Amino acid sequence: QMNNIAERARRKGAVVYAPASDARDSGRVIAVVGQKGGIGKTTTSTNLAAAIVAEGGNTVLLIDLDTRFGDVAVMMDVKPDYTVSEIARDATYLDRDAFRSILLRHESGAFVLPAPRDYRSWLNCSTEQLQEMVRFAAGMFDVVILDTPGTFNDVVGAATELADRVVVVTSTDLTSLKNTSLLIEHLGLKGRSASEVVVTLIHGHDVAGAPSKADVEYAISHPVDYEVPFDRNVRKASQ
């Protein structure tokens, strides 16, 4: 026991996820990364989890690995008793029944493991423990989605190392594009093929003269696989 305690997303030949039974016994791991805060990374993670469940046939666990703000619990309106850091520290003692019992289930059907509210809770939690926990979870769920911090750190590195697919979220502002370009270059140097990196462009503002899809692709040297258009009503509803 534990001690102390969507439509299937596709692009030309590359997919965000595939059923685990198609390739291996453990589930697919998807890391959602974005190298700037406020661009829609967590919104992408939560909606992706709900969409995959809605398609049917797959169990989904969303793990909040954001070491700074961790907003998954707020966005999915769940109240945690246990969080990632507590569970990961006891990763060696994980038991399937105990692990499932501490997970929260969102009304969409997706399971959630939130981040701690206090960033200091991460201090005694190593990336190796996080990876061990994620591997354990992938043995229980068809799809494990990792929501990550908005800046590159050891946790982002650990998440992308484990992931079968890396969903890179970017916006059209210059700092986001610059950081996204560097991230994609880094992933390539780590051996990631272009088909394993899925870029989602979110238009967060209705600004005349904003970079086009073609401009973004040129800036980051990678195709934009999905675009989310600006919607004023959605922006108002989220405030």
Regions found by a protein language model. Give the residues of each.
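Pre-Walker A adenine-sensing motif
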Residues: 15-23
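Walker A/P-loop phosphate-binding motif and the immediately C-terminal alpha-helix
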Residues: 26-74
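Phosphate-binding loop that captures ATP/GTP phosphates
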Residues: 55-112
